[in-house]
Amino acid sequence: MPASVNEVAQAVRRDWSPNRPVVVAGSTHEGEENLLLSAFQSLLNDFPDLLLVIAPRHPERFESVVKLVARQGFKASRRTMQSGALDPDVQIQIADTMGELPVLYAAADIAVVGGSLIPIRGIGGHNILEPCAVGVPVIFGRNMANFLEISDIALSAGAGFQVGDKADLIVQLKRLLNDAPLRGVVGEAGRKMVEQNTGATQTTCELILPLLTVR
């Protein structure tokens, strides 16, 4: 990861809190947030300080996701409203920013990539190379028709986990949240996979450079 990107990610993590476990769910679609929130509720029993960051795929859905989270009773915030350290009472942050997702992945402990968790017409997954390139373990669903080769390579490399339903998602999240060394091993496997298959420096720069001028 370029030094400048690493610095941005470190600053984001400091604002979230270095001590809280953080899961970033990126490129989510309608229906997936419900699944994620249900899984999150179950995880709070074992990880009461867990922070879930949800980055909807489409900006026009930011407001509806904020309302969905509020209806379910979670303490939430919008990333665009954050100034300085995040209130420790916030359980879920909505990443209502553009171009920032790779840095959010880099600041996370675990990444969940949307567009794959439930069947969605016309959608067959999203780019799992983003979290892999920054050394973060990735979880994705079975609906990866548009990224079959990449997902197969990632699974073979031990760079992530594929889940079939909410129960499976909870199991894999618990496994990773409970095991920091495992997160390191899986994240490093993803970084090496990107390096071996596409060239880490070029890929990481292509993924992240556009956001360096975007908060």
Task: Report the location of each language-model feature.
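Nucleotide-activated sugar donor-binding and catalytic core shared by glycosyltransferases
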Residues: M1-R215
